[in-house]
Amino acid sequence: MSINLYLIGIGFGDAKHVTEEAAKTIKSCNLILIGKKKDEKSEIADLKKNICKSFIKINSVKFKEFIIPERQLPNKKYINSVIDWHDDIAKTWVDIIKKYTSSTARRNINVGIPIWGDPSLYDSSQRIASRVKNTLHHTSIKLIPGLSSIQLLVSAFGIPFNEIGKSVLITTGRLLKERGWPDGTETIYVVLDGECSFTFLKDSNIYIWWAAYLGMKEQTLIKGEVPKIGKEIIKTRNTLRSDKGWILDVYKLQRLIRN
């Protein structure tokens, strides 16, 4: 038996974000895994499932929801806790796939993992998939690209990705908070930030383009100089998260040149 494991980029909440290649891959899947965090509202998992279902005309795909194991932080270094966390998630994937393969006569199984944005930008899913491949014999991995939150952000605001001849950094909120603004960098894109880490930057000459729920009916856009608009972003983010129980957001930071 061979297993084809697809990490499928599905954009950010709108089926129109899904590429033709991703749609064809979804249709070809026998099993699609949908993860959700413990105590998380089902809406975010349902959103992923509904995006996938919009490309499936017959009930030929089995959807399996699972609770994503929690990452254990106390008494562990960050990297070690992430490694253990990936091991736990991989074991969950393996158990689900094994159970499915034991119940089917198929010799070739296509398993899909829908990923927000583009799977190439989130190394966790790739590392987890590699663990699955090492555990289950005759397993292959393929990434199916999707529209990333950064692409949707610059499109929503109608701004360029970069400045002419200037460098760009894509980082996480945790690293922005820990390391600050790197020398020689003019533009920063921040993902996976639950703390509005731009508030920890000491430089006041920074402009921000912040977006939440890109492509969804709740899409929210705020832009302005960080000292003037930062508190509004924090308040808006907290309100949106409280209302929906979850949030997907991203932002661009750029240093201002004062005359």
Question: How should these model regions be labeled?
Answer:
Residues L5, P182-N259:
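A contiguous loop/helix-start segment that scaffolds small-molecule binding in enzyme catalytic cores
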Residues F63-I68, L143-G146, W209-K217:
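A generic structural motif
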Residues M1-S2, K24-S28, A105-R106, I164, ...:
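Flexible, charged surface loops at secondary-structure boundaries
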Residues S2-T139, K223, I229, L248-R258:
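Class I S-adenosyl-L-methionine
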Residues S81-T92, I159-T172, K228-D243:
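A polyampholytic, Gly/Pro-enriched intrinsically disordered region
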Residues I34, I113-I115, L143-G146, E163, ...:
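General beta-strand structural signal in soluble alpha/beta enzymes
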Residues G117-G184, R241-K244, I257:
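Class I SAM-dependent methyltransferase SAM-binding "motif I" and its flanking Rossmann-like core
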Residues D39-S42, S148-Q151, M216-E218:
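Short gly/pro/ser/thr-enriched loop/turn and capping motifs at secondary-structure boundaries
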